[in-house]
Amino acid sequence: RHNRILTPHPGEAARLLGCSVAEIESDRLLSAQRLLQRYAGVVVLKGAGTVVAGVDGKVSIIDAGNAGMASGGMGDVLSGIIGALLGQKLELYDAACAGCLAHGVAADVLAARQGMRGMLATDLFSTLVRVVNPDVIETEDDESSNSFT
């Protein structure tokens, strides 16, 4: 019961708690806590100011990310990032926080480079690699096609 990470957006959270999206958004911290009480594990309440809550009382607000992330597949990419971090033996809460931060920073870098409109989940891949590997030196081919800077 405690070995899970739940990653709802506000609409999914509202369905899980039997309330309205407005109620979820009116107090995101309380909503994450309510989800945690009901489902245990770690809760990642996605959205503006993503809330990560763990059963041990830890709570983090991830302020990275932007409105361009409100597109199909973004949650799948986030889950994949978190899963990869779990595969590297991070604890649930730490993997959720690190995954949300990397995901959000990659989206912010991408938005600064090409704008938020029309952002696709697959657009994050090349930027994400550079976000999690900041010391990698880019080649001329990288710079001409998909520069991080």
What feature does the model see in each segment?
Residues 1-64, 135-149:
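Glycine-rich phosphate/dinucleotide-binding loop and adjoining beta-alpha-beta core of small-molecule
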Residues 8-10, 45-47, 54, 63-64, ...:
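Active-site proximal loops enriched in glycine and acidic residues that flank catalytic Cys/His/Asp
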Residues 12, 31, 80-81, 106:
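A general alpha-helix detector
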Residues 15, 71-102:
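Short, small-residue alpha-helix embedded
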Residues 16-17, 62-69, 79, 83, ...:
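Short beta-alpha connecting loops at secondary-structure transitions
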Residues 22, 76, 87-88, 130, ...:
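Short, well-ordered loop/turn and helix-capping segments at boundaries between secondary-structure elements
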Residues 28-36, 92-106, 121-129, 144:
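Short, well-structured alpha-helical segments that form the helix of a local strand-helix-strand
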Residues 105-149:
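Charged C-terminal helix
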